[in-house]
């Protein structure tokens, strides 16, 4: 019986590896598009893609609560391009301002930016816990995980992902694997 399990496991691993080696229908097209874009980028732009910053760091006045993309920030973004921004509660005033901030950053960047937020649920929810937003609030992902109900996790993911996408975010720093 043990020998049978080993063979079955080897077969599953072999099939998975073989499947991973098959080219996808999009891989050549996507690779070509990326390669074409890279040939037009300067070294500074390529290195800038490695960095994600808070919006206010692009305004050297050190005002920690920037809620709009200023002309200075726009100029600094052009001179010091970055790959993305991480938005925090202090950068958020209301729904219209948030959508405008994200759209303005995207339009000011030559390359589509990663726009991230920390929307884990529970105490860490920059939008759901903000007084200007009427969004569903979830307990922490840890609490949902403790229920053992995958449908609750799926529902949280769909809901949070949906409203983040609506506002222009394309990365959520969640779920996380926090341990006590």
Language-model segments: residues:
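Enzymes and membrane/adaptor proteins characterized by extended Gly/Ser/Thr/Asp/Glu-rich
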Residues: 56-66, 76-180
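Residues within well-ordered alpha-helices
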Residues: 34, 72-73, 160
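N-terminal glycine-rich anion-binding loop in soluble enzyme alpha/beta folds
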Residues: 31, 35, 44-66
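Sec-dependent signal peptide cleavage junction
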Residues: 19-36
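Bacterial N-terminal signal peptides that target proteins for export
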Residues: 1-12
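Bacterial N-terminal signal peptides
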Residues: 12-20, 118
């Amino acid at each position: 019986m043990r020998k049978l399990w080993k063979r079955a496991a080897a077969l599953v691993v072999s099939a998975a590896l073989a499947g991973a080696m098959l080219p996808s229908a999009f891989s050549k097209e996507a690779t070509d598009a990326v390669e074409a874009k890279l040939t037009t980028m300067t070294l500074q732009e390529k290195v800038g893609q490695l960095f994600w910053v808070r919006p206010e760091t692009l305004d050297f006045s050190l005002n920690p609560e920037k809620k709009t993309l200023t002309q200075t920030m726009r100029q600094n973004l052009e001179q010091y391009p970055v790959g993305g921004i991480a938005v925090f509660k202090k950068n958020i005033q209301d729904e219209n301002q948030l959508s405008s901030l994200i759209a303005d950053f995207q339009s000011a960047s030559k390359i589509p930016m990663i726009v991230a937020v920390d929307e884990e649920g529970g105490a860490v929810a920059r939008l759901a816990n903000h007084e200007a937003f009427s969004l569903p609030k979830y307990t922490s992902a840890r609490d949902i995980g403790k229920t053992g109900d995958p449908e609750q996790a799926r529902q949280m993911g769909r809901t949070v992902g949906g409203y983040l996408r609506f506002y222009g975010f394309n990365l959520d720093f969640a779920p996380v694997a926090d341990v006590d």
